Amino acid sequence: MSRPQFDPSAYAAQLEDKKSRLAGLLAPFAAPAPEVFESPREHYRLRAEFRLWRETGNEKRHYAMFEQGDKHTPILLEDFPIASRRINELMPRLKAAWADPALGFKLFQVEFLTTLAGDALITLCYHRPIDDAWRQAAEKLAAELGVNLVGRSRGKRIVVGRDYVEEELSVAGRRFRYRQPEGAFTQPNGEVNQKMLGWAYEALGQRDDDLLELYCGNGNFTLPLATRVRKVLATEISKSSVNAALANLADNAVDNVSLVRLSAEELTQALNEVRPFRRLADIDLKSYAFGSVFVDPPRAGMDPDTCELARRFERILYISCNPETLAQNIAQLHDTHRISRCALFDQFPYTHHMESGVLLERR
């Protein structure tokens, strides 16, 4: 993880630059002006990863980060203003604890995962085998800090407490509970994530047809969007994300979602009846009356075949972490769909990265 340049006084200008950049990328498609959703200026990041750096000539170690492209010049940290208050509260207490050799010996990396609800999980990574002595020390530390702990060494993983954190997010007046597993993707900026969920919920609107969701992850968007439609068919290929999504659906008593572990390409083959899939044996695809598709693809965007799948739908709700590939995908879809809404979500203040959303509707 590289270190963002933290400068709250520059926030407004940086956000305006992102807005102009997004508007410029979408201008060829006659997009409306983007709705802009700001981030808190500090303490917005719910997860953080630090290397440990040893001072030359002694055993003292520090949290360290690096500038982009420079892995040899550490920036030593005592706190981290962009990280959640919970992470900042835990950093010095964990640092004091690694003086115990059972916890600190050959510890080289620390990962924090927290939630708006106040839950926390710390992952400790080692260049040595961890054993029962580590577990005993970790159980004591977890109780003292009020956290869950995961220890990792080559070929071994020990969990103290839970291997996930519990989050609560509010969308349109309803609270949704989420399990967010250690090591799996979660949106880093909780406040902005909540705004994204609200925007997607509003943009989709109340429908009497069905929704197809690609790349559903742990069900971040699935839960609120399922309340807007008759049924949802959701796909995801990550096993840990699928398991988390299934648990989240059960925890929230959402019973109109079927989740299958298929790639977008495999689902396209299934919908085209090119080949059967055993994982779809209990799902009657012909029973769905899809009106909308929701996509939240990786940075590479949708491949051309997935774009052609999306083209079948009246409405395409697209959340993107890369505006360049978003624009490329829209260029492929523009002859059949127009942009009726777009939004900028400032998930990553003080960086050039941005999250954006568009609603495309059939012409």
From Swiss-Prot:
Gene3D superfamilies: 2.40.50.1070, Vaccinia Virus protein VP39
Molecular function in Gene Ontology: rRNA binding; tRNA (uracil(54)-C5)-methyltransferase activity, S-adenosyl methionine-dependent; tRNA binding
Active-site residues from the entry: 321 (nucleophile), 355 (proton acceptor)
Binding residue positions for S-adenosyl-L-methionine: 187, 215, 220, 236, 296
Pfam families: tRNA_U5-meth_tr
Annotated GO CC locations: cytosol
Enzyme class at the top of the EC tree: transferase
Entry EC number(s): 2.1.1.-, 2.1.1.35
GO biological process, one term: tRNA methylation
Catalytic activity, as annotated: uridine(54) in tRNA + S-adenosyl-L-methionine = 5-methyluridine(54) in tRNA + S-adenosyl-L-homocysteine + H(+); uridine(341) in tmRNA + S-adenosyl-L-methionine = 5-methyluridine(341) in tmRNA + S-adenosyl-L-homocysteine + H(+)
Function description: Dual-specificity methyltransferase that catalyzes the formation of 5-methyluridine at position 54 (m5U54) in all tRNAs, and that of position 341 (m5U341) in tmRNA (transfer-mRNA).
UniProt record similarity statement: Belongs to the class I-like SAM-binding methyltransferase superfamily. RNA M5U methyltransferase family. TrmA subfamily.
Protein name per the record: tRNA/tmRNA (uracil-C(5))-methyltransferase
Species annotation: Pseudomonas aeruginosa (strain ATCC 15692 / DSM 22644 / CIP 104116 / JCM 14847 / LMG 12228 / 1C / PRS 101 / PAO1)
